[in-house]
């Protein structure tokens, strides 16, 4: 299997869910073995680019933020990263004229649509995979995420909320190709009781029912059209997991299991994997 990039550039406009700032984002093709690179076009400096890598993750509060050594940052990258992973895009340049990726409708679907409109180009380099060789586990209080060796990627994810609108939900995922049909359109969510506090901290400035599922104090879904799936919440957490894990630069070949995962836990798993060179190896499809 070969690496892929886009056939042509594709752009969108939107607001950041936390910053509330309107930005333009363009996904551009690039050469083999580049990976995913973000460029802040509103900063006129050679220091305006950031590699979408787990070691550049600088904040995981409610979203995933990456930054470089010059303190240039881009936040809320996970939905776009999930779309790139789900569409098997290995190499792309992301140009953005602001500090936050547009939230769009709160899911990955608009980014999947953009990539499908641009088309995909196979490149003259083998696609790489991260194959897990030993059991690795990260735990924070009652939250946990672990991966074990496997010949295929599988994910089993459970979430557990006290809110009756969500409750306990579980989802198993076996096929990357089904991401665009079954996971990509699952939206982010939040509780109305938290909005004032978040806004006082400079967060959720762009949040609305157009880009998030809102849940009130009576555990009622406030969006006029309701949910897209009965288990949309766990689907979105799975989406976040894929986006965060793609900051390792490849698809992971492992059996992954998570309980009450978070952006912080997702990132910690990657750090734990790469801290032990005997726990993984990079392979091509012919070596799987």
From Swiss-Prot:
Cofactor: Zn(2+)
Enzyme Commission number(s) from the entry: 3.5.1.108
Record has Cell membrane as a keyword: no
InterPro entries: Ribosomal_Su5_D2-typ_SF (IPR020568), UDP-acyl_GlcNac_deAcase (IPR004463), UDP-acyl_GlcNac_deAcase_C (IPR011334), UDP-acyl_N-AcGlcN_deAcase_N (IPR015870)
One GO cellular component term: membrane
Keywords carried by this UniProt record: Hydrolase, Lipid A biosynthesis, Lipid biosynthesis, Lipid metabolism, Metal-binding, Zinc
Catalytic residues in the record: 263
GO MF annotations, alphabetized: metal ion binding; UDP-3-O-acyl-N-acetylglucosamine deacetylase activity
Residue positions binding Zn(2+): 79, 236, 240
Pfam families recorded: LpxC
Family: Belongs to the LpxC family.
Role of this protein: Catalyzes the hydrolysis of UDP-3-O-myristoyl-N-acetylglucosamine to form UDP-3-O-myristoylglucosamine and acetate, the committed step in lipid A biosynthesis.
The protein, known as: UDP-3-O-acyl-N-acetylglucosamine deacetylase
Originating organism: Rickettsia conorii (strain ATCC VR-613 / Malish 7)
């Amino acid at each position: 299997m070969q690496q892929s990039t886009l056939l042509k550039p594709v752009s969108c406009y939107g607001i950041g869910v936390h910053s509330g700032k309107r930005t333009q984002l363009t996904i551009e093709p690039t050469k083999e073995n580049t990976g995913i690179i973000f460029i802040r076009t509103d900063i006129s400096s050679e220091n305006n680019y950031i590699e979408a890598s787990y070691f550049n993750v600088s904040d995981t509060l409610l979203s995933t933020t990456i930054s470089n050594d010059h303190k240039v940052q881009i936040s809320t990258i996970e939905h776009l990263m999930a779309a790139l992973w789900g569409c098997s895009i290995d190499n792309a340049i992301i140009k953005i004229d602001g500090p936050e990726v547009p939230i769009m409708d709160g899911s990955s679907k608009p980014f999947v649509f953009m990539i499908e409109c641009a088309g995909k180009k196979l490149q003259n380099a083998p696609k790489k995979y991260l194959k897990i060789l030993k059991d690795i586990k990260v735990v924070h209080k009652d939250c946990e995420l672990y991966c074990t060796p496997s010949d295929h990627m599988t994910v089993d994810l459970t979430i557990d909320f006290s809110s009756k609108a969500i409750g306990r939900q579980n989802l198993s995922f076996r096929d990357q190709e089904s991401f665009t049909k079954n996971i990509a359109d699952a939206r982010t969510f939040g509780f109305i009781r938290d909005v004032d506090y978040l806004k006082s901290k400079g967060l959720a400035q762009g949040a609305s029912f157009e880009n998030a599922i809102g849940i009130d104090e009576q555990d009622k879904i406030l969006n006029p059209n309701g949910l897209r799936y009965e288990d949309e919440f766990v689907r979105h957490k799975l989406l976040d997991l894929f986006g965060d894990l793609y900051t390792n630069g490849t698809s992971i070949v492992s059996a992954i299991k998570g309980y009450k995962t978070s952006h912080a836990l997702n990132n910690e798993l990657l750090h734990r994997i790469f801290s032990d060179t005997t726990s993984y190896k990079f392979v091509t499809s012919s070596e799987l």
